[in-house]
Amino acid sequence: PRVERDWKPSFVLVGADVGRMVINPLSEVQNYEGFVSLDFDRYLFNAEFGHSTFHRDDEFLYEGSGTYYRIGLAKNFAVASKDRSIFTMGLNYARSNFDQTLIFEDSFFGEQSEFTFQDNNAAARWWELTGGIHVNLWENLNMGYVVRLKFLKKTFGDENVEPWDVPGYGRNKKNGTELKNATVGLNYYLSWRFDLREKALSVPRS
């Protein structure tokens, strides 16, 4: 039977990226991220937000911090799941605003000199194709992950400081010069489901 469309929201899903919290102590980049999802019919409206700091000290010093957000729609292919699992594919628009500082040393006429470039108004935007799953663990507690293909990235800011890292996007460079115009990301979430009302799994049309 055909299913009656139901556009009234029935739940809100609120979560945090716990995978990042585990990786942070071992990484030069510190990320903290959360999300809110609202269902309507077979779709989810997603709003994601985060903060990132980075510090790289090798042949040069590069550091900065900033915030980012993503908004988008995803289709839930598991609307008839009795255990309230969610399996989605969707599209996001993402944007980041951040500051960055680059410090390096070079020698001129036998003397070592230090050069500093700073940009407090850097920004970037990109798009994402996503696929994800959330499964129920206990009561309203859920566990899940989202895989992202990030593409069509564009950066804005001081031309003298090409971003090495972009909050929410990741590494902007494959090496010292070559840019990463596309990349893949993975988030591992714990979330809590707030039910707004009961929703029938399927309602046949007469």
Q: Model-predicted segments: where are they?
A:
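Extracellular/periplasm-exposed beta-strand and loop segments of Gram-negative cell-envelope proteins
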Residues: 23, 49-65, 98-108, 112-124, ...
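Start-of-domain marker
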Residues: 2-64
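Short loop/turn motifs that connect adjacent beta-strands in outer-membrane beta-barrel proteins
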Residues: 2-10, 78-86, 137-143, 196-206
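Structural signature of outer-membrane beta-barrel channels/translocons
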Residues: 37-41, 74-80, 132-136, 140, ...
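Residues that define the transmembrane beta-barrel architecture of outer-membrane proteins
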Residues: 10-12, 28-32, 65-69, 85, ...
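Transmembrane beta-strands of outer-membrane beta-barrel pores
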Residues: 18-22, 40-42, 51-55, 75-77, ...
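Outer-membrane beta-barrel "beta-signal"
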Residues: 70, 180-206
